[in-house]
Every structure is written in C-alpha cells, then in structure tokens.
C-alpha cells in the first residue's frame, strides 16, 4: 500500500499534547501528590499549610 510521505509528518501548527500519559487530566503537581500518596510518601509543608498530603517541616 502506497501513501504520501507527508501523512507521516507533523504540522508545526499542531499543538503538542503536554500531558499525553496523564489519564486523569491532572496537572503535574496534582499528579505528583497522587503518586507520592500511592507510594506512602508525603511532601514536606511549612506550617500552617500542613494537611493530609504532606507533613510539617517546621
């Protein structure tokens, strides 16, 4: 089967899908919180911003 080679090229005007592997449509920060929570790890937060997704650094 023959087809034009141009069909394999991407258009420069075509927007890049930034979070292609992000199935839940989360931004990178939300995705990181989700992954760290799933791994049982939490980020360090500065009080009074401490909550369930992080632990207090100070």
Swiss-Prot record:
Disulfide bonds: 44-56, 45-54, 50-57
Name the record gives this protein: Conotoxin Pu3.6
Free-text tissue specificity from the UniProt record: Expressed by the venom duct.
Domain characteristics, as noted in the entry: The cysteine framework is III (CC-C-C-CC).
One GO location term (cellular component): extracellular region
Subcellular location: Secreted
Propeptide positions: 13-41
Organism: Conus pulicarius (Flea-bitten cone)
Family membership: Belongs to the conotoxin M superfamily.
Domain of life: Eukaryota
Annotated GO MF terms: ion channel inhibitor activity; toxin activity
